[in-house]
Amino acid sequence: MEERYIRNLGALTEEECAVLRGKTVFVAGCGGLGGYLIEMLLRLGVGEIRAADGDVFEASNLNRQLLSSPSTLGSGKAAAAAARAREINPEVRFVAVSDFVTEKNAAELVKGCDAVLDALDNIAARRLLAVACAEAGVPLIHGAICGWTAQAAVVMPGDDLIGRIYPEGSRLSSKASLSFTPPFCAAMQTALCTRILTGRPVETGRLYMADLLDMELESLF
């Protein structure tokens, strides 16, 4: 085993680490959640990572987005993710798509993936992504943040969990996001994703919610 993955052992088996190197994961969004998800997957040793985002960095991203810095303001988020991938783990095949997830491209983006990570910032795109994953038979690991709170869930094909989390007419209540909420949420998502990729049991149809202000964790549905 390569030395860079040695500290995975004990938590993961050598066989599981080898399995991860043969997996492909799509990260939808390269901003607050996406940057941390990509970082964790790169260091974990997933073989191929695809990432899509049509946005560019602006000053309001600096408080929480791992890939944002004064030097990246105005540059594309997907391109910044690709540069980070080359720096952190050049052995990982990284495919960057400088476009938003849309009805036209969602099916192609998730095609051939073993898991999809939701790092989107709007409900409409989440619904599109959930439909594409269901049609492709790919597990979706949902994640969302707001202020002090973070949530994550595994959505398996055939389960309309996204529809239950965001019923028709739902709106995002706030754009507030603190520096520590995205990495906490990304850690939950990556842990769930790792269990799926390695064949470990994972509970589906549950929404895990963390309140970091009151230090409470609950499971809904």
List each model region and its residues:
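A structured beta-alpha segment of the ubiquitous adenosine-cofactor-binding alpha/beta core
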Residues: G74-A115, L120-R126
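Hydrophobic/small residue at the entry helix of a nucleotide-binding pocket
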Residues: L33-G34
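Aromatic pocket-lining residues of Rossmann-like dinucleotide-binding sites
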Residues: L41
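N-terminal charged helix/coil linker that caps or initiates catalytic domains
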Residues: M1-F26, A144, R164-I165
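Glycine-rich phosphate-binding loop and adjoining beta1-alpha1-beta2 segment
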Residues: V46, A51-N89
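Conserved N-terminal Rossmann-fold NAD(P)-binding element of oxidoreductases
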Residues: V27-G29, A52
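Hydrophobic residues within alpha-helices
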Residues: L37-I38, A81
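Glycine-rich phosphate/adenylate-binding loop
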Residues: E2, E108-A115, A119-F221
